[in-house]
Amino acid sequence: PIATRKASQICLDHFCADLPELIGGSADLTGSNNTFSKHNTELTPDNPSGSHIYYGVREFGMVTIMNGMSLHGGIRPYGGTFLVFMDYARNAVRLSAMMSLPNIYVFTHDSIGLGEDGPTHQPIEHLVTLRATPNLYNWRPADLKETAVAWKESILSKSPSCLILSRQGLPQVKMSEDKISNISKGGYLVQKDEDAELNIISSGSELQLAIQAAKDLDQSGIKVNVVSMPCLDRFLEADLEYQNKVIQKDLPSIVVEAAHPNSWYKILGRDDLVIGMTTFGESAPAKMLFEEFGFTAGNIVSKAKKLLNK
């Protein structure tokens, strides 16, 4: 298993080798955000050509400085902090979207999956806030492959992007080349069954639970389509033909995401279901929290059977 914050660092090691215009940094969380690549050197008074900035505990200052670098041109800044601390940088993030500055925000520790730091550090409403921001793309990858595509698309983007990354290790999703090619569309079918009775849609760390639930439901004779949605913003820009190909509209849907559910209702029907977070978290190991808040394959199976009246 690889945490997507670590997967992000692996990607940085590749991209920074060929793109010297990438200037990184973190708001005093470099070791946790994994924003320092093996090609970076520290920017200091003695090394003004360094490519990594230690911004200190000042998220707003970090993003305003990134905005300035983007406005100058010739530089592609990326900066990291915990997702929950995005609140401190919110105004500057909003301005970057308003000005179409292609900053890359590395927001790690993306859910209750961060564990014992507790509710002060566990983001709940933050993904909804970011997804509601015009001209801002939010990628929540499930594994190394999705993280690599998220980085590539963020680098190619003319708008700012957020990489929403896990603290905890995640399994790698097995997929064919054609599925990998669809990641950039924001949402795609990880598993399709011609006899499907249900869509299960997920992102990030919960995708593994959706895949396991689909296997368990198959044992009960219930066929399922599994959809990975690393970037809802990008998916909603796709034509309706593609959207309806990915999310079969004549089937009920369940979304599984350890965040506030409000982002999802624009693609769901009235009777569809979101397994999400509508309260603040708790301080406990990640596995215990996922069980407490219903993020288990068993709970998805139970909800699916109830939704299908089986």
Language model segments and positions:
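Thiamine diphosphate
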Residues: 1-310
